[in-house]
Amino acid sequence: MVRDTRNVDLERGLELCKPEKVNKQNLFTNIVKPQKDKINIKTDKIKFFLNNLFTEFSKFHDSCYPDGRISTRSKLRWPLLIIWCILIVFAIDKNFEVKDFLSIWINESFINENRFYSEIWGPIAIYICLFILLLLGLIYCSKIVVKAIPLISIVIAAVVVIIAVAMVKILYICHWLIYKILILAFGIKVKPLGDTLPTHNGETGSHSKATVGSDIEQIEFQNMPTPVKK
């Protein structure tokens, strides 16, 4: 009996595609791991870039300002900002190859016929544009921060006032509730303090103005002589 071999490859492929036949280790090695490695490489590159950037700026800053302070009235603040921008531009180009990418794009798009001039002026134009954009961005951000400082202080003061008023109100409400609970639940009556009068046995007691007359009458009644029975 002759076996039909036309569908052998199809059957074998379907057999290999079954879930129990899939090799998870090969799937991870061939698909997941390369993508994960690419992400890790990009992350390490960004970390390395930031580390180099702040290291270079720290060296420059420490050499210009040993005490660690930058005065806003110093005449060197603008040169410092310009040098800071130049360091950022070169650090970005060193780690992410911005110049090479833009140079290729400029050469292929605009000036293929003048390659000599494009190789000279292309990178210079790219650096100048990046520098200007970065400088304008830093200046704009500094203006926003300066304008936001008074607003932030006003907001903080308003929040503090609101918290203080709320605390006073809460204390007043708690005092009122405790007073009402003592009166209603336990029947405690708070009497106002009045004058002190001597009692019949020589002791002093606290009396209010409303009970002064009745106490005097009671004392006189107790001191009256008792009648003698005949």
From Swiss-Prot:
Record keyword Membrane present: yes
Topology class, membrane: Multi-pass membrane protein
Cellular location(s): Vacuole; Membrane
Record bears the keyword Zinc: no
Main subcellular location of this protein, as a coarse class: other
Entry keyword set: Membrane, Transmembrane, Transmembrane helix, Vacuole
Tree of life domain: Eukaryota
UniProt family annotation: Belongs to the UPF0494 family.
Name the record gives this protein: UPF0494 membrane protein C1348.07
Native organism taxonomy: Eukaryota, Fungi, Dikarya, Ascomycota, Taphrinomycotina
